[in-house]
């Protein structure tokens, strides 16, 4: 009986953790959650990374306002550059 109670309490705590992590305003995505903090190679940088700077930044859910898609290479997300 005690084991069932502990399992129930742990599942309840995990559920509350997930529910409390959801944003109240789903349309307002926080910049920290969108930004990966990794550089990427924009199309204007050239074909290879050798001798070229990585001028793009990877954003997970599209480019925010003030940034444009630089048609670069990113494994996940979008390669964006400040406009």
UniProtKB/Swiss-Prot annotation:
Its main location: secreted. Residues 1-21 form the signal peptide. One of its GO terms (cellular component) is nematocyst. The keyword Signal applies. GO terms for molecular function: sodium channel regulator activity; toxin activity. Pfam families: Toxin_4. Disulfide bonds join 40-79, 42-70, 63-80. Residues 22-32 form a propeptide. Belongs to the sea anemone sodium channel inhibitory toxin family. Type I subfamily. This is U-actitoxin-Avd1g. The lineage of its organism: Eukaryota, Metazoa, Cnidaria, Anthozoa, Hexacorallia.
